[in-house]
C-alpha cells in the first residue's frame, strides 16, 4: 500500500475511501515529444512526488539505478515506467507503457509513448484513447521535428487539450527568457493545427521536481499552476457529453424470451428514458424504455457509460448498428475521405482490399486514391502514390457496405476505423474520417458474367483467400 492510499484510508475509512474513489472522474493522458526530452522521468517524478510508489518498487528502482540508471547516484525515476530490458539498457522508451494513479480529486491513466521516429505508430496508438497530451520540450533544444510530429498526430486524433511542458529548466539556469522564446516558437507552430485546441505551457524540471507536483521556488517568475494541478482541473467531461448521442451496438442481450436489450458503451452525448431513437443503417425508429446497468436502471446515461438499452418496439438491430436520436442527421455512405496513419513496413497500396472495423462494424474497403501526404515538419502537403511506415496522408476510400459514420473530430468512436491486412490479420493502419462523399452504386455492372462466376468459384473452394463477393459490391 502506498503512502497516499494510507493517508486517505486513515482520513475517510474503507467505505468512505471506496465511495469517493468510485465517483472520481477519469483522465487519460499521454506524454510525448522528442527523444530524451524526459517523458519517462516526468511520469516517474509525478508518481514519486504524489506518493504513488510502493516501497518495493522504490527499492527496485534504487537497485536498478546503480546498474542501468542515467542519473548518477540518484534514483532514475524513468525506470518506474521503462519496463522492457531493451528500454532499460538503452535508456529509451520503445513500447507504450501505461501507469495508473489517483489523487483526492481525480483518477489518471498515463500512456508513456516513445519519442523515436521509428516508433511513431506506437505513439499514435497510445494517443488514440487519450483526452489530453503532455508534450515535452527540452529547454536546451527547443521545438524539434518530433515535437511537431507528435503535436500534429495528437491534434489529428482529436485531442483538444495540450500541456506543453518545457522540461530540463535546471540545465538552462531556470531562465525565463529561454522559456519565453520556446513558448513563442511553439505558439507560432500551433497556429497551423486544426480545430480548437486548449494549450497550456509550463516550465518544469522532472529531474529536480520543479513545478511537477509542487510549485518551484526557483522559478518565481512563473505564476501559473503546477503540472498536477493542471491535470486535476482540466475539464474533459464537458467535451464528451456535449456531443450528439451515439451508441454503437456491441451485443444483443437476450437472456430469456421476456428481455431483449442492446448493449454497448455510449460514445458521445446523453440518452434518457423516453427518448425517440432510430437505428442505422435501417432507419427504424422506437422509444427507449429502460437504461439497464449492473447497478440497476438509470433515468439517463452519458458518454463513457456501458449500458443496455431496451426499446418499446421489436425492431431489427444487430452488432455494428448505430443507435442515435430520431432527429439526428447522420451520414451513411460507402465513399469517404479519411486521414490515414500507416503502421507497417509494407506501404499502403491503392486498389488493395483491406478489412475495416469501425464502431463494432466490420466491412471491406480499399483506397481509390491518396490525395496527399503530410510533411510533419511544417504541416504542408505533397503528392504521394502510397503511404510508407509512419506516413500520414489523406486518402479516398470506398467500402463494400454503406456505413453510418461521423467526422472523427465530432466523434472518435464513430469516425475512427482500423485497417487490417486480410491475409495476415495484422492491424496495418488507422483511419480518421474527414468527410463523407457521394455513395458509389452499381459497381457490379463493371464485372462480366465470367468474372462473377470465377469469383464465386474461388470463394467456394478457397475461402482462406478471403476474396470479396463481387456480386455484393455496392450493396448496403
UniProtKB/Swiss-Prot annotation:
InterPro entries: CysN_GTP-bd, CysN_II, CysN_NoDQ_III, EFTu-like_2, G_TR_CS, GTP-eEF1A_C, P-loop_NTPase, Small_GTP-bd
This protein's record includes keyword Acetylation: no
Region (G1): 33-40
EC numbers on record: 2.7.7.4
Keywords annotated in UniProt: ATP-binding, GTP-binding, Nucleotide-binding, Nucleotidyltransferase, Transferase
Region (G5): 205-207
One Pfam family cited in the UniProt record for this chain: GTP_EFTU_D2
Name of the top EC class for this enzyme: transferase
A biological process from GO: sulfur compound metabolic process
Span of the signal peptide: none
tr-type G domain mapped to chain residues: 24-238
Top-level taxon in the UniProt lineage: Bacteria
Stretch list, region G3: 112-115
Annotated GTP binding sites: 33-40, 112-116, 167-170
Example of a GO MF term: GTP binding
Complex formation: Heterodimer composed of CysD, the smaller subunit, and CysN.
Function according to Swiss-Prot or TrEMBL: With CysD forms the ATP sulfurylase (ATPS) that catalyzes the adenylation of sulfate producing adenosine 5'-phosphosulfate (APS) and diphosphate, the first enzymatic step in sulfur assimilation pathway. APS synthesis involves the formation of a high-energy phosphoric-sulfuric acid anhydride bond driven by GTP hydrolysis by CysN coupled to ATP hydrolysis by CysD.
Descriptive protein name: Sulfate adenylyltransferase subunit 1
Gene: cysN
Amino acid at each position: 500500500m502506498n503512502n497516499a492510499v494510507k493517508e486517505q484510508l486513515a482520513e475517510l475509512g474503507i467505505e468512505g475511501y471506496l465511495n469517493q474513489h468510485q465517483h472520481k472522474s477519469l483522465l487519460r493522458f499521454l506524454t510525448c515529444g522528442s527523444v530524451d526530452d524526459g517523458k519517462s522521468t516526468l511520469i516517474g517524478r509525478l508518481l514519486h512526488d504524489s506518493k504513488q510508489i510502493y516501497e518495493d518498487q522504490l527499492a527496485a528502482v534504487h537497485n536498478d539505478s546503480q546498474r542501468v540508471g542515467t542519473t548518477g547516484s540518484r534514483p532514475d525515476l524513468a525506470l518506474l515506467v521503462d519496463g522492457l530490458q531493451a528500454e532499460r539498457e538503452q535508456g529509451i522508451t520503445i513500447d507504450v507503457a501505461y501507469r495508473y494513479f489517483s489523487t483526492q480529486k481525480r483518477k489518471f491513466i498515463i500512456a508513456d509513448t516513445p519519442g523515436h521516429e521509428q516508433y511513431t505508430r506506437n505513439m499514435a496508438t497510445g494517443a488514440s484513447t487519450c483526452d489530453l497530451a503532455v508534450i515535452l520540450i527540452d529547454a536546451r533544444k527547443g521545438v524539434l521535428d518530433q515535437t511537431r510530429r507528435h503535436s500534429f498526430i495528437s491534434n489529428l486524433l482529436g485531442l483538444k487539450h495540450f500541456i506543453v511542458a518545457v522540461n530540463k529548466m535546471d540545465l538552462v539556469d531556470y531562465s525565463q527568457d529561454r522559456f519565453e522564446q520556446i513558448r513563442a516558437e511553439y505558439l507560432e507552430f500551433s497556429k497551423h493545427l486544426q480545430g480548437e485546441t486548449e494549450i497550456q505551457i509550463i516550465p518544469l524540471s522532472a529531474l529536480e521536481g520543479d513545478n511537477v507536483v509542487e510549485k518551484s521556488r526557483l522559478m518565481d517568475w512563473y505564476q501559473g499552476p503546477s503540472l498536477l494541478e493542471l491535470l486535476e482541473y482540466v475539464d474533459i467531461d464537458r467535451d464528451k457529453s456535449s456531443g450528439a448521442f451515439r451508441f454503437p451496438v456491441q451485443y444483443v442481450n437476450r437472456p430469456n424470451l421476456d428481455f431483449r436489450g442492446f448493449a454497448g458503451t455510449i460514445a458521445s452525448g446523453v440518452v434518457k428514458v423516453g427518448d425517440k431513437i432510430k437505428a442505422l443503417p435501417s432507419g427504424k425508429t422506437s422509444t427507449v424504455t429502460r437504461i439497464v446497468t449492473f447497478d440497476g436502471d438509470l433515468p439517463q446515461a452519458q458518454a463513457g457509460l456501458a449500458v443496455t438499452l431496451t426499446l418499446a418496439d421489436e425492431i431489427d438491430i444487430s452488432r455494428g448498428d448505430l443507435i442515435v436520436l430520431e432527429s439526428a442527421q447522420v451520414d451513411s455512405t460507402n465513399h469517404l475521405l479519411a486521414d490515414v496513419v500507416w503502421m507497417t513496413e509494407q506501404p499502403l497500396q491503392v486498389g488493395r482490399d483491406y478489412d475495416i472495423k469501425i464502431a463494432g462494424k466490420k466491412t471491406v474497403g480499399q483506397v481509390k486514391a491518396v490525395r496527399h501526404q503530410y510533411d510533419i515538419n511544417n504541416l504542408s502537403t505533397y503528392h504521394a502514390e502510397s503511404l510508407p511506415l509512419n506516413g500520414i496522408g489523406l486518402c479516398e476510400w470506398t467500402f463494400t457496405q454503406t456505413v453510418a459514420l461521423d467526422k472523427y473530430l465530432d466523434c472518435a468512436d464513430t469516425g475512427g476505423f482500423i485497417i487490417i491486412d486480410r491475409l495476415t490479420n495484422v492491424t496495418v493502419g488507422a483511419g480518421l474520417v474527414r468527410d463523407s462523399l457521394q455513395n458509389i452504386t452499381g459497381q457490379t455492372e463493371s464485372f462480366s458474367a465470367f468474372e462473377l462466376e470465377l469469383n464465386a468459384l474461388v470463394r467456394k473452394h478457397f475461402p482462406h483467400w478471403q476474396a470479396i463477393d463481387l456480386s455484393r459490391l455496392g450493396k448496403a
